[in-house]
Amino acid sequence: MLWLWLGLSGQKLLLWGAASAVSLAGATILISIFPMLVSYARKWQQMRSIPSVARAYPLVGHALYMKPNNAEFFQQLIYYTEEFRHLPIIKLWIGPVPLVALYKAENVEVILTSSKQIDKSFLYKFLQPWLGLGLLTSTGSKWRTRRKMLTPTFHFTILENFLDVMNEQANILVNKLEKHVNQEAFNCFFYITLCALDIICETAMGKNIGAQSNNDSEYVRTVYRMSDMIYRRMKMPWLWFDLWYLVFKEGRDHKRGLKCLHTFTNNVIAERVKERKAEEDWTGAGRGPIPSKNKRKAFLDLLLSVTDEEGNRLSQEDIREEVDTFMFEGHDTTAAAINWSLYLLGTNPEVQRKVDQELDEVFGRSHRPVTLEDLKKLKYLDCVIKETLRVFPSVPLFARSLSEDCEVGGYKVTKGTEAIIIPYALHRDPRYFPDPEEFRPERFFPENSQGRHPYAYVPFSAGPRNCIGQKFAVMEEKTILACILRQFWVESNQKREELGLAGDLILRPNNGIWIKLKRRHEDDP
């Protein structure tokens, strides 16, 4: 009997202890999340007056309405901006995170001109394992210092040195496309992307990886795999926690991919540092000029030389951050713009004829390389690229995390809100672009651009955090398009609704860009 009593008493004590532990854990969790709940409730109350796309529910917000498929979600977001275009801003709650969508020039200006609202969205943190805290992902004093150091490296006179690389890789691309002349329609997206990757590798790192000739190299495969994994992780909140992410195969693949990319970049940097040291030793020994190796200067060489106001140089980790940032930002966006240009020219033959006429005036029938003077003369092609970026901006939306309360469109928007700027919708404002779905490069003639709101068109963002590489991007786009269009006539029967637009960090066609090629001059070899 005593043993039974002791056993029952022991069980009660264990149950009481377990219950106490659970209660203590629950109380600890409640105490830790209580401030967040208070902050959430305050934001909910303060932002009640901002128009909402639909009824939001506490904690889950509008998540129940959101389409899980990426292409469908982007179309849903665009639908909201069209449905509520008469409103200055609209509000969405993604779980406990408030978002305001901005698609009117006067409201976009408020955010982009602010010297305080420069923090990128929290989603950019998923780029940090690869890019570190480089120019794209850093903020505050680090971003300001780094931006000031790097701006001179994008001066036009320096960019001119990269034109040879662009010409060489564009010619390789043209040769690759030859096999499709007078054949069935083909998907050109991957061809253009590999060309852009070759260009950014050689201009950023001074390394010719030959992606167009060997697209199965480990580095090339890892660059694309890493980009896809980052996009997917951003959309899946259950993968946001690092330790939990590593439980999944993709998390482990991500870790292996990072090692591959960082090892490659570190080796390139170390190799170039060693070469520079040998060059310094050679000249320091009084041996005269270094025997010419015909080695081109790359961004990497500039990064190894730049200093801040106090004369400090970038560390190897700093340099790797920026080189990797150039790699990430410098090929996908440019490749997308070129692909969209080919699609729009292929569906608008009257525009393509005007481009051909301009190319003939500048180049005649020659196949010589494109020069900087040629690029300056290609004014109509420049308008074609601008109009392409209006209709299909390479970056269809981007975000700022508000670092303080501000007023936008007559509404108070609280600190911590994600301000989503949507160039895809902004560029379709009929106040500034009548018949916005029509492709009209003439919109960007100087006489037609007068009086247009400066923030009605922001394909490269604007304000303090605008794209530092936009001149490089436009130079590359014009060079590649000029090389392709001097040789080929482009046709496309693909309808807009067949593209399958997906708005990740880059505006992509899920179904590819399908074109046909004909030789412009039948007597060409």
UniProtKB/Swiss-Prot annotation:
Can you list the GO cellular component terms from the UniProt entry? endoplasmic reticulum membrane
Q: Which reaction does it catalyse?
A: dodecanoate + reduced [NADPH--hemoprotein reductase] + O2 = 12-hydroxydodecanoate + oxidized [NADPH--hemoprotein reductase] + H2O + H(+); tetradecanoate + reduced [NADPH--hemoprotein reductase] + O2 = 14-hydroxytetradecanoate + oxidized [NADPH--hemoprotein reductase] + H2O + H(+); hexadecanoate + reduced [NADPH--hemoprotein reductase] + O2 = 16-hydroxyhexadecanoate + oxidized [NADPH--hemoprotein reductase] + H2O + H(+); (5Z,8Z,11Z,14Z,17Z)-eicosapentaenoate + reduced [NADPH--hemoprotein reductase] + O2 = 20-hydroxy-(5Z,8Z,11Z,14Z,17Z)-eicosapentaenoate + oxidized [NADPH--hemoprotein reductase] + H2O + H(+)
Q: Which UniProt keywords apply?
A: Endoplasmic reticulum, Heme, Iron, Lipid metabolism, Membrane, Metal-binding, Monooxygenase, NADP, Oxidoreductase, Transmembrane, Transmembrane helix
> Mind telling me which InterPro entries this protein's record contains?
Cyt_P450 (IPR001128), Cyt_P450_CS (IPR017972), Cyt_P450_E_grp-I (IPR002401), Cyt_P450_sf (IPR036396), Cytochrome_P450_Monoox (IPR050196)
Q: Which Pfam families match?
A: p450 (PF00067)
Cofactor(s) needed, names only, are: heme
EC annotation from Swiss-Prot or TrEMBL = 1.14.14.79, 1.14.14.80
Q: Which domain of life is it from?
A: Eukaryota
Write out the annotated subcellular location: Endoplasmic reticulum membrane
UniProt key word Zinc: no
The annotated modulation of its activity is: Inhibited by N-hydroxy-N'-(4-n-butyl-2-methylphenyl formamidine)(HET0016) with an IC(50) of 38 nM.
Main location, first listed in the record: endoplasmic reticulum
Q: Pathway, per Swiss-Prot/TrEMBL? A: Lipid metabolism; fatty acid metabolism
What transmembrane ranges does the database entry give?
A: 14-34
Query: Where along this sequence does the record place binding of heme?
Result: E329, C467
Q: Which GO terms describe its biological process?
A: fatty acid omega-oxidation
The way this protein sits in the membrane is described as:
Single-pass membrane protein
UniProt GO molecular function: heme binding; iron ion binding; long-chain fatty acid omega-hydroxylase activity
Purpose of the protein: A cytochrome P450 monooxygenase involved in fatty acid metabolism in the eye. Catalyzes the omega-hydroxylation of polyunsaturated fatty acids (PUFAs) docosahexaenoate (DHA) and its precursor eicosapentaenoate (EPA), and may contribute to the homeostasis of these retinal PUFAs. Omega hydroxylates saturated fatty acids such as laurate, myristate and palmitate, the catalytic efficiency decreasing in the following order: myristate > laurate > palmitate (C14>C12>C16).
Give the family this protein belongs to, as stated in its UniProt record: Belongs to the cytochrome P450 family.
Q: What is this protein called?
A: Cytochrome P450 4V2
